[in-house]
Amino acid sequence: HTGYIFVNMKNSIFFCLRDSSGTIWEDYLQHPFVQSVGNGSLSENSFKYYLIQDYLFLIQFSRAYALAAYKSETLEDMRSAVAAMSNIIDFEIQLHIKYCSSWGLTLDDLSGKCEDIATTAYTRFVIECGHRGDLLDLMTALAPCVVGYAEIGRKLAESPTLDQKLNPFKSWIEMYSGEEYQKIAASAIHQLQTLFEKRGGPNRYNSLSSIFNQATRLEIEFWEMAWKQQE
């Protein structure tokens, strides 16, 4: 069971931001796209569109971590950013390409497509947060994706409606509910907390909350983008 990783973090800045977001966070976690992945009813067309856009998304997120390295003020933060970028480029994207091939998508299918407007809007918002702000702003913008997928994966894996044998998205759920990804999310929460303690404070909370909420809304739009392919 992977939930233990988050037990001692409930008072951290991440959970304060999440819990003060109103219905936005639950709308993200409970979007029809997510629910349809959980019960196996999502159309193949919708999921393939998501996979293509997620490939393009990952490329831009690796750039966000390159920016994080530039914005870092300590070697520890710089190493963390470089490790995250390397993980996306050398590991996560390669895994994604391999997973996409199981859905009949080639590398040409992935790289030959244009970014959806939702993909561009989300990724450029994150990068812009890093350009105009500091590392805390950038990590806050990244948090809904990194940590949100861990929470979604965990909830779907624990759902009584998950058909372990017949759900075609079972391996996707296992990837984000697995201990390895859960630890990545926990590390992101810890880093955000460390940055907040160094650079945060009450005067920054409202601006961080605004960044967090907007990034979460853009996550919802990313789901919605793929969900519309059902129609």
Where are these regions (language model features)?
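His/Met- and acidic-residue-enriched segments that coordinate or traffic transition-metal cofactors
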Residues: 10-11, 34
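Alpha-helical bundle segments that constitute or directly flank the non-heme di-iron/ferroxidase center
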Residues: 22-27, 41-71, 91, 140-150, ...
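Active-site-proximal alpha-helical scaffolds that flank and shape metal-associated catalytic sites
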Residues: 78-183, 213, 217
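Long amphipathic all-alpha helical oligomerization modules
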Residues: 178-212
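Acidic, carboxylate-rich catalytic segments that either coordinate divalent cations
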Residues: 206-231
